[in-house]
Amino acid sequence: MAEGPSLHPKLQVDSNIPIEISSQIPQEPARNLAFQMRQSPLVTPGSTTKSSLSVPERNLLKQESEGPSRQSGCMPLSDKYVNKQTSPMASRKFRKERTVYTKEEQGLLQKHFDECSTQTRRKLWSWHYQLVLQRGRLRYGSRTTELSTGR
C-alpha cells in the first residue's frame, strides 16, 4: 500500500483510531457546543457509550437546566442578544432604509461635499508643500533634487 505525504511526528494520527465524519455529529443549538466538543463521538459498532463529562461540565449543564444562580456569577443574556426567531430567515440582515433626497437637497449636499473635499485637498497640498520647503528638496523616485528657492 502506498503511503501519503509524511507528517511531522507530533501531527501523525494512529491508523487504528476511526476518523470522525462531521455528518455523524448531531446538529444542536450552540449552547451545547462545549458538550459536543468534549463528548467522545467515536463509537465502534456494537459498543456502548458512556458520557465522558468531567465534574465541572456536569455542574455547568445542571446550572443551565436550573437557570442562573447567584453562585455562578453568570448573568443571563438580555433580550437584545437572544435571537428568539427560529426560522432560517432570522439571521438574515436586511438593508437599512434609503434616504430619498429632493433635487434641491441633493444639490446642497453635492455643493457641501465639493467644498469640503476641495478644502481638504488644498490643506493637504499646502501642508505637503510647506514640508517640502522646510526640507529644501523634492524627491522623484530614487533621485533627489535640491529645491531652488530663487534667492
UniProtKB/Swiss-Prot annotation:
| Gene ablation phenotype (knockout) | Female mice lacking maternally transcribed Obox1, Obox2, Obox5, Obox7 as well as zygotically expressed Obox3 and Obox4 are infertile: embryos arrest at two-four cell stage due to impaired zygotic genome activation (ZGA).
Determine the domain of life of the protein's source: Eukaryota
Chain intervals for the UniProt region annotation (Disordered): 1-97
What is the tissue specificity?
Answer: Specifically expressed in oocytes and early embryos.
List, as start-end ranges, the regions of compositional bias called Polar residues: 37-54
The family this protein is said to belong to: Belongs to the paired homeobox family. Obox subfamily.
Task: Please describe what this protein does.
Answer: In contrast to other Obox family proteins, displays a truncated homeobox domain and does not bind DNA.
This chain belongs to which protein, by name? Inactive oocyte-specific homeobox protein 2
